UniProtKB/Swiss-Prot annotation:
Protein name: CaiB/baiF CoA-transferase family protein ZK892.4
Keywords: Transferase
Keyword flag Electron transport: no
UniProt-listed Enzyme Commission number(s): 2.-.-.-
Gene Ontology molecular-function annotations: alpha-methylacyl-CoA racemase activity; transferase activity
Organism: Caenorhabditis elegans
GO biological-process terms attached to the record: bile acid metabolic process
Transferase in keyword set: yes
Domain of life: Eukaryota
Active site: 154 (nucleophile)
Amino acid sequence: MYRFLSGIKVVEIAGLAPVPHCGMMLADFGADVTVIDKKNPAIEQRLNRGKTMKQLDLKNPEDIKKVRDLCQTSDVLLDPYRPGTLEKMGLDPSTLWNNNKGLIICKISGYGQTGRMSQETGHDINYVALSGMLPTFSGVNATRPWPPANMLADFAGGGLSAAFGILSAIYARSHNGGKGCLLDCSMTEGVAYLSSFVQHYYDQPNLFTDKYALFSGECPIYRTYKTKDDKFVAVGAVEPKFYQNLFKLLNVDGRDLFVNPGKITEDLESRFLQKTRDKWANIFKGQECCVTPVLDIHEVGSYGQHVDRNSFTKTSSNWIANPSPRVWTQDELAALSSKK
């Protein structure tokens, strides 16, 4: 992995989910990340790839001074706490900027640093719920909204958004006289921003709100199907050329797709139950139908495409994703092209 962020120093106050994920991404691309954690933390931190660990007690004034000293020579401070917590410790922006005007202070919280809910507790499901997106993510026909694991707010709306903000602030610092800033990352707002496409097109009922809308979870050409071995394939045949290929290969009469989608769904369900997931994967290979196997976390790294690109690393229990995006230098790309 190319160390584009080499020379950037980050102080990460240990926390849950979004902050360690953000710190890991920065470390993956070369930043020098120091994690401040207490001895014997209640929760084991596993997103510490490439980081340096430092045990300090943030209730101890001497250790607070050590954090302040670290910030004096660092570029970024990652704050996982409820708004106002670091300020009570004497690690407020004014004090930190007096010692280091270039420090970028990134505060990741559920609802933001201001507003009537800034001090409220919550977790991923709460932030997604308040973003307005939970019903859409659950599907139009769901009997109740269900949370899609804890990835959307914590890691996309939180960690990933914060990393983008930090890199933007580092760039801005090179043009504003070296001044840092405070990044107020609300995970609720991060999910909402992530959902901009949905917001802009929500007035199109055939996309989101009709019973068989394209992204409702029930549309016959955009959903999952069970296979003979009780596994699943994913169908994403949105464009006409793709769903026409799908119907032809499966010998399904798709002329009533938009008139009687329920019947098309039944026909496709029946077809996919006739073979195993992996047999279907081989059948659809190269057929331009947008059909892929649904992989679980224990098998994902051994899938052919992922092996070709070394996308995952095997641990004792799971496959762990390698950093993304992949970087190709001009020389590497030229060498790759010459081999084709």
